[in-house]
């Protein structure tokens, strides 16, 4: 384990004394450091009546137990302090370490022995081996009462609210959209879990179209056959209009009786562990599926601003700007009298996407979004540079299969009988509008491009994203991060995983950093906490994180010529190979990386260290033997070496306590293991869209074309002597349509190059 501590805030000495005393730790400057440490430990051992026993059970050094040490006249040394500190953090001497100084350096322990008051204060704010802050571990065991009142320590809210008798209720928010055009505002179901508290509390809201259930059979039937040829497109210029959102004007709302109690109780639901962690710390949890989902109204409009408006209206309700009812009759209105009006959003993938969209509405009350692996423009999810593409791991998926998956109203048989005809008409229109035939950008995609409205963002923004996320590719977070206005506070956790959550990783205090930010922004806890702009997981070693100033924006490039000759790529495969790759795209990837398919393979040995930060640009001069074509490219860190593997694996099951023995979570981490290669970046382009998205151009057979396009942005470090491998090819059996046409691309390597954005070493 290595310590990477970002949630700790420097605190004034007088405030440390006050905060410690409120927890029952009394530091006396008139006592020796040794006496203060003993008192601190005996207070920490509050679960024992006889605190001599745990002192005797612990070690001061390799020869002496702690009780004997405190009974002796020996001075407190750095070595003894570190030995005690590591035991408090659940490490075992003689098992986890034998040389405490070597272990301190190996783990990059954040505390330097000196000022004992500050040392003890920071120690309470340091993560244990099992993933909880020491103070959170002690509070979960009962250090202070569960009094349903906010308590902040080092600017972070403590778990002092009972999660076991939290209020669980349902309301139906009256939205400003009528997606099913029945003449009434769509009602949106809101599932609420909130702490019992006499005053107002903030909310964390997860906007998830999946939350009320999914229609997997319908979605599977809507998947597309990828074994089709690339379409030849007529040259033209694409035009789009500024997106419009028509909202209902509720100037004369239907009267409803105002009541103070909800009528529908919330049973068991699936929850998100970051929300679970925040609930006993005094944050209400809201789960909202939105339009077109089970127990809500309307149609599934999939990513447009009608869908986002309905989520926004929940925030409006929390701030008194929209109504909510106790049930679907709309006869009894209920206000969010428990809300302080401040909201943060959470969740990954589609959930993080809705956070991005909500932020671009500029809605008052949305203080922070935590957008984990979120989409910033839906075109870049299902299309790329004029090509129909599939998100990594999901060949054949397109927007209407996602619509089928999330339109959960059909899971209610009565809703199916009443509304399925209207839904099918809506689905058919969507199927036409997304234009799978050409892969071109159009008004449908323009209406689902949140980057156009990034200037409206007012909330503080936290992103998480993985360099190996080929589902929601890194381009999404890169574009959103760079599109935000300069005055907006923005932060990015950029890790080396795939499409995964990171709130229960051992190597970083992510959830505690979120606690510190939300406690400051939503609760008003006073602290000097500042989250860095970019927190990057160093790919060159295990459990190491660094802070950077930006993602992209580099002024230097490493320029690499591709070669000295011309080489060709054959598009067509034998029937046997084609069928084999179509059935198992993983076999295609394996052979591609080993240089065994129809491809050009180019290798470089680095002459100096490389620190890549941004989007690599591929500059090509090529020609096609026919009137169309696609080019695929992947850049690899090639050669046997230790690297992060992209899926976190459990270190210890159910050891991370989200409250007081509440929703225990697994402690996980990305393994750091020997692999033959690593994909650094990739990209795909339709030769007919080589200039820009809005231009469809002719491809004349055997005529040279010169163009550039960017591969997926990333942050990646390599050392002198490492090997870069670029593979150029046509059809990608995971991502693109699987064209069978017999044609070839010829690349002029001497007139082609690669530009890698580089930064000086951190």
UniProtKB/Swiss-Prot annotation:
This is Xaa-Pro dipeptidyl-peptidase. InterPro entries: AB_hydrolase_fold, Galactose-bd-like_sf, Pept_S15_Xpro, PepX_N_dom, PepX_N_dom_sf, Xaa-Pro-like_dom, Xaa-Pro_dipept_C, Xaa-Pro_dipeptidyl-ppase/CocE. One of its GO terms (molecular function) is aminopeptidase activity. Coiled coil: none annotated. It comes from the Bacteria. It is an enzyme of class 3 (hydrolase). NCBIfam families: PRK05371.1-4. GO terms for biological process: proteolysis. It catalyses: Hydrolyzes Xaa-Pro-|- bonds to release unblocked, N-terminal dipeptides from substrates including Ala-Pro-|-p-nitroanilide and (sequentially) Tyr-Pro-|-Phe-Pro-|-Gly-Pro-|-Ile. Removes N-terminal dipeptides sequentially from polypeptides having unsubstituted N-termini provided that the penultimate residue is proline. HAMAP family: Aminopeptidase_S15. Keywords: Aminopeptidase, Cytoplasm, Hydrolase, Protease, Serine protease. It is found in: Cytoplasm. Belongs to the peptidase S15 family. One of its GO terms (cellular component) is cytoplasm. It holds the Pfam family PepX_N. Homodimer. The active site is at 349 (charge relay system), 469 (charge relay system), 499 (charge relay system). Its EC number is 3.4.14.11.
